[in-house]
Every structure is written in structure tokens, then in C-alpha cells.
Amino acid sequence: MSLFNKITKTFQWGQHTVTLETGEIARQSGGAVIVDMDGTVVLATVVAAKNPKPGQDFFPLTVDYIEKTYAAGKIPGSFFKREGRPSELETLTSRLIDRPLRPLFPEGFYNEVQVVVHVLSLNPEASADIAALIGSSAALAISGIPFNGPIGAARVGYINGEYVLNPGPTQLADSKLDLIVAGTEAAVLMVESEADQLPEDIMLGGVVFGHEQGNIAVRVINELVREAGKPEWQWTPPAKDEDFIAKVNGLGEAKLRAAYQIRSKQDRTQATRAAYAEVLAALAAEGAAVDKVKVENLLFDIEAKIVRSQILAGEPRIDGRDTRTVRPIEIRSSVLPRTHGSALFTRGETQALVITTLGTERDTQRIDALAGEFEDRFMFHYNMPPFATGETGRVGSPKRREIGHGRLAKRALIPVLPKKDEFAYAIRVVSEITESNGSSSMASVCGGCLSMMDAGVPLKAHVAGIAMGLIKDGNRFAVLTDILGDEDHLGDMDFKVAGTTTGVTALQMDIKIQGITKEIMQVALAQAKEARLHILGKMVEALGGAKEELSVFAPRLYVMKINPEKIRDVIGKGGATIRALTEETGTQINIEEDGTITIASTDGDKAQAAMKRIEEITAEAEIGKVYEGPVTKILDFGALVNILPGKDGLLHISQIAHQRVEKVTDFLTEGQIVKVKVLETDEKGRIKLSLKALLERPEGYVEEERPRREYGDRGDRGDRGRDRGDRPPRRERGDAPQAAPESDVPSPQAE
């Protein structure tokens, strides 16, 4: 009898065959599912604590997506030869899984839940992120943990006017869209996408298509749950103390309503903190035991009720705007004197100082990914220090949120970047958030675009981003343009759209409630387009296009092409030639396999000097051309003369002067500079030179004729120090040497 009660479900999903399996591996976890998607295999596990920690006031969900290098048949390249800290892709995929799962846990469920996904095998044409999403959903669904799932997920491409389900990297190279959708059978929960300036209706169609295809996975997971699901937890939300809630409402609602009449974020924050403190003090004065966390949660609920009811009633928002107005915008470029490009983008109380730095090929980011190594010449880094929100906190390496926001901004800008052959620089953009009150990632998109244009990067178009919010109560809803931080915290959706006047370049949506409808997404996209066009108008006013001149502090790139067979000449033995060249000229030189050479320098004269040297190194000697160079070596039969860098030609003794030359040293010395003419070159690159061809012939000089040899001219034999013509006539083949009179003894030749 088998140890395992293995349950397997297999289904065809577009071009992929997918298998879900449970019951054999990781049986001590709360739920474990292996997903095999055409050779990409992931193990998704979930474990939940049986009880919440005392005083816990939030839901502690952690998701860790871990790629094992053995999945691609590799050994880690680190010193310790094992996997280390998460890569950027692992962090982004962990967030991708977390976002659609989090809103499906019931309110009040504060038990710690940990989802861990291991990539065990990787087929590069079947991306592991979709398999990881499906596996995480299935593991939670069979675990019995309180969870209002399962969810499905799908990747959508757009190739030749048609949507494509779960395209691999090869197909994505030809796709105008890379979109991931996740949601329950009823509604969409999460969208993450990058697009090549596509119109809103194509984007919405992609979301709907992806949701429909994701439901195929939902139905299979439900079948798996029916056969392999564990008993549901006997969990009930904590009972509400209605009398205590009424008391807190009575003490705090009026104070909080007054606080939310204040338009300034800092003043409003101080007022709400004061209201919290007064309510806690009043409760303490009554002598009752006060659970601070419980009271603060109730006061937060009051805040949400106030803000949401005002908006749904058509009243002004927190800062006095209506639902469609964008906050005031201020833009300044060339903010920093010695950076290559910079811009300060301010929208209301959100501000981004964005800096662009241009680099060379050596500055590109080399990424050793599981699917293979590649170089990335465009980097976007987002930083938000605690002072941006008037708080204290940890400063150091980027957190998951910062990595995610940087990636979103990068996605928005990639479609408008120039091609490498148009602009060969490596580009690094850093967004420093100096103030934050909502939508700092979209401020980073706007500032990043302006900063690159200030640096002279020839972008195809301006790109702007806007964050939309949602307040939904039953069938009533309001979509908010350019949300504040409080509206984000108290609302139901964070919907970010970036793009040009032509179309959308990036879209990200996170839902806090259990899904939104197609109608709401249509309204949000239309409203976002209106706001985006408004912001783009402001950006064009501030900076109409990319500067034509780069900063004087930016490196200049000079590109030249050489014969690929000459690459080794430029590099030299052990890299000696190119190393000396870079040190002498102070430039950076990069050589590609096709013979393209890129020279980087902040000094144009130095770059030109390097180009000249390379031209000389790779130059071919031209027959009939006169060169000047030093004598590098004296030989018995002539001399070697350096006519080009790394190229010596032979000046034969017979080509030194019109008169007979007995000793080369009578005419030449090592180091002597002479002018010579190229007589000929051969297929091996050997060069024959002449000095006498440039000298005047002496009066009455007659070129000495030399007899032709019977078996063809084998060239000069200068190593004998004289002409072959001085020799006596050669014996005919078979002639015997003159010897004694004939005898009867046969000669050796006669035998």
C-alpha cells in the first residue's frame, strides 16, 4: 500500500498542458500543490498559525517566491555556491502573488499565514510566475484556512491584433502587450501590465480575456478541493461589542469629522492624532480597561465611514477637489548642476526629484537570471525615505515596496526609449521621493520622463502617470482621479495608469475588496486618460522635448566599425594593446563581435585620438602609398620599417639605394626615421617596401638586369648578402663534377 494519497488534475490551457498535484510532497504543510506547466515545475506551500499573536492588529501574510538554480541546471555563481538574498525578479514575483491573495482573507483574521513557492524546474518558454500564482491559490484553497478563493491567473499577449494566452519569452518579443490578470471566478482582483502605447479598449479587452482564461484554472482548482481539500477551519470573526463601539463613536466621530475639514495633510494628520489621544484619554478617565489597538481600529473605521460617505454623497474630497480634478502641478528641469539630467516634479503634496545618469556599455546591468544571462541598459530605482511622510524610520537597502514601485515606473517608460543603435548609452534613472501624499510612483514616471529628456535621451514621446481610486458601497461607486494617501488607505482600489497621448504604456491595479466589474474599469480608464492628457500638457509646456546637447559632464560615445578579423589586433596579446590605448587616451573602449567599437570619453579630443589610433592599428598598407616610420631592426639582407602601428614591412637590401649596397648599416640605423613606398603585399599580410623608389636616379644610371632562372623566380635571396647573378653558370641537372679520368668504377649516380 502506498504511503501517499496523491491526487492529480491535468488540463489543456492554451498551448500549455498543466498538471496540479497534491498528496505526495510537503505533507506536513497546511496545503501543498505542485504545478507542472510544460516542464516548469513549482511547489507552492502554505502554513497558518493556529492562533493570532496577542495584540495583533493587522493581517500578517508573507509570500516568498524562491528560484532554485538547479531548476535550470545551474550551480550558483557566488563564493558559497548556494542561493542567497532574493533577486529583484523574486521580490517582484512575491509581490505579484501577494496582491490578489491578500483581499480574500476575511476581515478580523489576524493569524500569521506564510506562502512559500519554490521553482523546482524551469522551461524558459513557460514562465514560472503564472504557475506560482495558480499553485499558491490551490494550496490555500485545499488547506482549509479561511480564504474566499480560489483565484485564477493568466498572462496575455497581443500579437498581430489578437490576444494570446500565456505567451513565452519568444512570443513576448513580438507582442505589444505583456499583461497579467488575477481574480476570482466573479471578478478581477489584480492587473499588472506593460504595453506599447495601446488604446484603452485594447487594454480592457486584454483584462477581460485574461480573466476568462484564468477561470479555467479556477474550475480545476475547485475540482482538486472537492477531492483533496482539508476540513475548513472553525473560525469565526471576533464578536463586536456594540455598546463599546457606540461609546467610541460618540467620543470620536465629531472630532474626526472636524479633522477631515482640514485641507493640509500635515495639519489634518495632527488633528486626527489629537482626536485619537483625546478618545483614549476619555476612556481611561472612566476607569475602564482600554485596549489601545481595539480603540484605534474602531477610530480608523470611523475615518473610513466619514471619507467614503462624503464622496459617495457628492461632497468635496478631503482636500476640497471633486472626483475628476488633478492637483496643481509644478515642474522644474535642470535642477542639479553637475548631474547629466534632472527634474523636480511636484503634484500637490507629492514630490519627486528624479535624476538621470548616462553611462557606457560597461555600466549596463548584467543579470544572471534563471532563464539565462542578459544585459539591461535601462535601470530605474525608486527611493522613499521616511521624511517624505514626516516620519522617522529605517534608511538603507530598498524594501519590497520600493522595488515594486521602481519596476512599475520602468515598465511605463520602456516603450518610449530609443533603440540601442540610435542611442547607445546605458541609462540609470533614480527617483528620490521628497514628499509623499499619494501616487508617488506615478510622479516618478512623470519626473523620470522629464529627467531623461533633460539629459538628452531622445524619447519617442512624453509619458505621464496617474493613480485612480475607488469608493464602492453596494451598487454605488465613485472613481477618484489623482488619489491622496488617505484616499488610498480608506478606499477600495489603487488603479495606476501611465501612457502617452497615443496610448497606455503601463497599468497596475490592486483591489482591496472582492473584485470590481468591467463597468468600473471602463470608467476608471476613461477618467485616467483625461487626467493623463492634462498632465502631459503641463509636461510639454515645461520641456517640449529632449535636449539636443548632452551635459558637459556626460560621456560622449563615438562609434566606429572595423573588420571583425582585426579585433585581435586592437585587443593585442593578453589585452595589452587595448589596455595601453585606454590608459594613454583616458577613454573607455568597448568592442563587439561584429567589429563595432564604442569609445566613451568626456573629452572629444581624447576620443578622436583613440579613434585615430584604432584606425592606424586596423589600417591596411596601400600599394603605392608612401609611409614614414622608424627602422625597427637591421638584418643582413635589409631592414624592418614600422609603417603602421603593429605593422612592419621589409625593406630589402636591393631596395635601399640605386647603387650596390654591401652593408645595410652603411645606409640605415635602428630608430632612424625613413620614408618608404609600399611595393606589394601578399595574402599573408607581408609588406615589401622600397626606399630607392623615392630617391632620384643618378645621372646615367641603368637598372642592372639579372638573368632569369629556368625554374621561375623564387624572389630575392638577400640573406646571402649578394645577388644571385654573381654566381657562375649553374650545371645542368645530371652533370657530374669534374674528376679524374674515367675508370671502370661506376659513379654513385650510375648505380
Swiss-Prot record:
One of its GO terms (cellular component) is cytosol. The keyword Metal-binding applies. This is Polyribonucleotide nucleotidyltransferase. Disulfide bonds: none annotated. It comes from the Bacteria. GO terms for biological process: mRNA catabolic process; RNA processing. It comes from Methylibium petroleiphilum (strain ATCC BAA-1232 / LMG 22953 / PM1). Keywords: Cytoplasm, Magnesium, Metal-binding, Nucleotidyltransferase, RNA-binding, Transferase. Involved in mRNA degradation. Catalyzes the phosphorolysis of single-stranded polyribonucleotides processively in the 3'- to 5'-direction. Its EC number is 2.7.7.8. It is an enzyme of class 2 (transferase). The gene is pnp. CDD domains: KH-I_PNPase, RNase_PH_PNPase_1, RNase_PH_PNPase_2, S1_PNPase. SMART domains: KH, S1. It is found in: Cytoplasm.
